[in-house]
């Protein structure tokens, strides 16, 4: 799974996921399913945000990478992926500026057009079950919830899906392709089932004991489908901004 994650996701996303796990004392090399889940969630958050801007009239518009956008403001503020201290600083700043109610839990995004925080969910289960879990945890009508599944289903607060159909289709296609690639490598079942994940972890640990450090065949193989998985959706200008604002790791 670790090899798959490093091949499948943008290096910035992988780096952010590793940083987030280490912040909570978790090891991406051991908790590989969680590593994959965090990367997937981060990517969906970025895809949700990318190419969506607000023009000088306050209207929401979509601008593809490469188009002039100097006078445009990003519609969404990305909160997910930052360390907790910085994330709360951003949330507090938004609340002080806009007057919106401060959430009890860290949200994933802030929507400047609708003036609301957004909680993004990516589930391997039924969307309505995961939606209810999120709603029961947050217990706030002020935070908008939007859930995606790997099967193409989605659910949002008051059926308000925020984004246009094409943008949501891009996210659904990406999730479905990730699922297909995992399945083709025999990783999907363990990703979905905790029991299977534990069995797979035991197998992995046994395999690592006699040949620790040796590269696996998977790490040297990139399927044609994975080439299409390369996240070309990331706006090059925003990629640089993300690296600058999110990754503040001390140099070794």
Curated annotation (Swiss-Prot):
Site features described as Important for efficient shutoff activity, chain residue numbers: 202-203, 206
Presence of the UniProt keyword Transcription regulation in the record: no
Transmembrane residue ranges: none
Site (Important for efficient shutoff activity and nuclear localization) residue list: 195, 198-199
Keywords: Decay of host mRNAs by virus, Eukaryotic host gene expression shutoff by virus, Host cytoplasm, Host gene expression shutoff by virus, Host mRNA suppression by virus, Host nucleus, Host-virus interaction
Coarse class of the protein's main subcellular location: host cell
Swiss-Prot/TrEMBL GO biological process terms: viral RNA genome replication; viral translational frameshifting
Function summary: Plays a major role in the shutoff of the host protein expression by cleaving mRNAs probably via an endonuclease activity. This host shutoff allows the virus to escape from the host antiviral response. Hijacks host RNA splicing machinery to selectively target host RNAs containing introns for destruction. This may explain the preferential degradation of RNAs that have undergone co- or post-transcriptional processing.
Domain comment in the entry: The probable endonuclease active site in the N-terminus and the basic amino acid cluster in the C-terminus are important for the shutoff activity. The C-terminus acts as a nuclear localization signal. The C-terminus is recruited to host protein complexes involved in nuclear Pol II RNA processing.
Protein name (database record): Protein PA-X
Gene designation per UniProt: PA
